[in-house]
Amino acid sequence: TSGLSQPCCVSGGKPEGRGGKEMTAKKMVRNIEPDDPMLQYSGRIDDDDPKAPVLIYAASWVKMIFTGTSVAVTLANHHAYWTNEMGYLLDGVQGRIRLLNDGKKKTYEIAEQLPDARHELMLFKRMDACHTVTFYGFTVDDGADLLPPEPKPARRMEVFGDSVSCGEVSEAVDYVGKEDPVHDGQYSNSWYSYAWMTARKLGAELHDTSQGGIALLD
């Protein structure tokens, strides 16, 4: 697999297979609401409730540029099947968050003890509709600043597809040229999907309407 970092849940219990500590009440933090104008969204997202947008399809994302030394995210995972994980890019380094499956709002630590400087975070949906995720905002240091987002690309593209378009088993590098392995979703990563790789090559914003095992025409 890719060797991505595996942060822990810091509120509401620890995900299976992950170590970690709970966030202490002594730390002063700033909560960033989902409708903060400094946040930037893209993808197939249900935004009927601006305080609780739902990320549905793979490669949907929310970005934030912030200062400070730590960042966490509050999510509610709506599990259908497989083990569910969210992806992120923090200052260009990719990681993933193992989600709990009880449908309740939880706060997950992404990073702490960062250099006290400018940081760029993109939280993205690694997996297809094996789950949906309600986003309730980020948590940063008390006194941290949010900075304006970078402009989106002028070019936009939309992909309709199945597993290769949403990145299912895209991290199963030991099975190249072989039959797909039996898995529980751990190899799925939309970042390495044909759809998102093509969008990055073309410098385009992507809307990825894809689901593993489902064709446009049956």
Model segments located where?
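Structural recognition of the beta-strand scaffold that forms the well-ordered cores
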Residues: 158-159, 206-209
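N-terminal secretory targeting modules
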Residues: 3-9, 13, 18-190
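Extended, H/D-rich, highly charged conserved domains that either
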Residues: 186-196, 200, 210
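Solvent-exposed loop/turn segments at secondary-structure junctions
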Residues: 163-166, 212-216
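Short helix/loop capping segments that flank catalytic or ligand/cofactor-binding pockets
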Residues: 167-169, 206, 217
